[in-house]
Every structure is written in structure tokens, then in C-alpha cells.
Amino acid sequence: MGAVHTRFVVGESRTNADNAITKTYGTFYMAFEVDDETLEVVDFSCTHTIDTTQSFLRKVFLGERFPDIDNWLEQKLSERYGGSSRKAVLVAYRDALKRWRFMMED
């Protein structure tokens, strides 16, 4: 197996009790693959019940510098994301960012 130059990190959060994601999965997860050199998000997925949710969020995150997303994510979600899991997306990203920073310290 060749050298891997990315890191995989998952963020977790809760959604509303009546949200379909909560009813189906119990919690909301977002997974990021981040390039070690450029710090760009090269792959993304999340728990979802509607495929368009993951498709939309992929467009938000792919190609962006992972640590810089925190500077604009809340505003972008407020303007462009009308899903009931908006707060969960922000919390899951910040959880993933915290885990990623911990991994980068090693």
C-alpha cells in the first residue's frame, strides 16, 4: 500500500428529536478526508435521509481549507442551508475540527 497523505476525521452532533436523521441513526455524523499538505477537504460524507443533503454539503466543503471553514460556515449555513439539521452541521464540523487539530499535534 502506498503512502497516505490525508487524514480522516469524523464529527458528531445531535439533531432535533423529531428529525428523520435522529430517528434513523440516533446522531448526526460528518466525515472529512483532509489533505496533509494543502489542508483541503478532498472527500466528505454524512449521515442523511435525503441524498440532496449530502450532495449539498459536499459542495460546501470539498476543496475548502479545513481549518478555515470555521471562519465562514455559520454565515453560509444561515444564508444557504434551510435544513432542520443546520445547527447539527455546525456542531459536527467543529467537533471534527477539534479532533483534527488533536491529530495534527501528534
Describe the role of every protein-language-model region.
Residues 15, 19-31, 36-106:
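Active-site- and interface-proximal helix/loop "cap" or "latch" segments in soluble metabolic
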Residues 1-12:
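Short, compositionally biased leader-like segments
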